[in-house]
């Protein structure tokens, strides 16, 4: 007998607050968590650890298919556990990002990782954070949410985050970067950023995180 495992997808542009929302939903629902944005970095790191050539589809595909990774919500952070080891800080390194770009360019690797992401949908349920979770990866998900916010608000949030780290940045530069990324994401040929037809669209521009979580939970309860 197969146990039904509900899937909640949360898509949206960079800086809308998807990560925080997904982490809180996973904690409140007791569900598993998938941070799809980190999955290519995780694979790149696994390849480096195992000495697999970053340009070798032959070596990367089996690694992707059997990727031993968990995403665990702890406090206000998501810990990434690769083969039993916390690699959260390693994932943020620039060289990991560059390696991820190389593996993401390989079609067979992308297909293998797509199947691996779908395997996260296991009991008791899954909250999946990304840009195409509801439109490509989990098209049959019971609950689909698209979290948005104005580019100005997202730039403002990012600026506050950087200032808290002691970094001074110009608002207009941040805004320009976000607008350029939005344009790329929404107009790309493969899996453009858009809400699924049956998604709840939440605009968090003038909402705090508690309000966003409350609306999301109400929607989830109405669907499950």
UniProtKB/Swiss-Prot annotation:
<dbReference type="InterPro" id="IPR003136">
    <property type="entry name" value="Cytidylate_kin"/>
</dbReference>
<protein>
    <recommendedName>
        <fullName>Cytidylate kinase</fullName>
        <ecNumber>2.7.4.25</ecNumber>
    </recommendedName>
</protein>
<dbReference type="GO" id="GO:0036431">
    <property type="term" value="F:dCMP kinase activity"/>
</dbReference>
<dbReference type="Pfam" id="PF02224">
    <property type="entry name" value="Cytidylate_kin"/>
</dbReference>
<keyword id="KW-0067">ATP-binding</keyword>
<keyword id="KW-0547">Nucleotide-binding</keyword>
<feature type="binding site">
    <location>
        <begin position="12"/>
        <end position="20"/>
    </location>
    <ligand>
        <name>ATP</name>
    </ligand>
</feature>
<comment type="similarity">
    <text>Belongs to the cytidylate kinase family. Type 1 subfamily.</text>
</comment>
<dbReference type="GO" id="GO:0006220">
    <property type="term" value="P:pyrimidine nucleotide metabolic process"/>
</dbReference>
<keyword id="KW-0963">Cytoplasm</keyword>
<dbReference type="GO" id="GO:0005524">
    <property type="term" value="F:ATP binding"/>
</dbReference>
<dbReference type="GO" id="GO:0036430">
    <property type="term" value="F:CMP kinase activity"/>
</dbReference>
<dbReference type="InterPro" id="IPR027417">
    <property type="entry name" value="P-loop_NTPase"/>
</dbReference>
<dbReference type="GO" id="GO:0015949">
    <property type="term" value="P:nucleobase-containing small molecule interconversion"/>
</dbReference>
<keyword id="KW-0808">Transferase</keyword>
<dbReference type="InterPro" id="IPR011994">
    <property type="entry name" value="Cytidylate_kinase_dom"/>
</dbReference>
<keyword id="KW-0418">Kinase</keyword>
<dbReference type="GO" id="GO:0005829">
    <property type="term" value="C:cytosol"/>
</dbReference>
């Amino acid at each position: 007998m197969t146990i039904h495992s509900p899937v909640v997808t949360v898509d949206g542009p960079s800086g809308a607050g998807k990560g925080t929302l997904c982490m809180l939903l996973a904690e409140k629902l007791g569900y598993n968590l998938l941070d799809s944005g980190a999955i290519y970095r995780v694979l790149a790191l696994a390849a480096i650890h195992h000495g697999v050539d970053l340009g070798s589809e032959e070596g990367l595909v089996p690694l992707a298919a059997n990727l031993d990774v968990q995403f665990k919500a702890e406090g206000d952070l998501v810990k990434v556990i690769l083969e039993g080891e916390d690699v959260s800080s390693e994932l943020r390194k620039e060289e990991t990002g560059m390696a991820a770009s190389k593996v993401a360019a390989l079609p067979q690797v992308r297909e293998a990782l797509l199947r691996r992401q779908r395997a996260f949908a296991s009991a008791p349920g899954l909250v999946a954070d990304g840009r195409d979770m509801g439109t490509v990866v989990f098209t049959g998900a019971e609950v689909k949410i698209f979290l948005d916010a104005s580019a100005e608000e997202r730039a403002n949030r990012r600026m506050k985050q950087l200032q808290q780290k002691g970094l001074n940045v110009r608002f207009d530069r941040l805004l320009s970067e976000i607008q350029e990324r939005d344009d790329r994401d929404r107009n790309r040929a493969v899996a453009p950023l858009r809400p699924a037809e049956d998604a709840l669209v939440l605009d968090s521009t003038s909402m705090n995180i508690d309000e966003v979580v409350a609306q999301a939970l109400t929607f989830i309860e109405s669907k499950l």
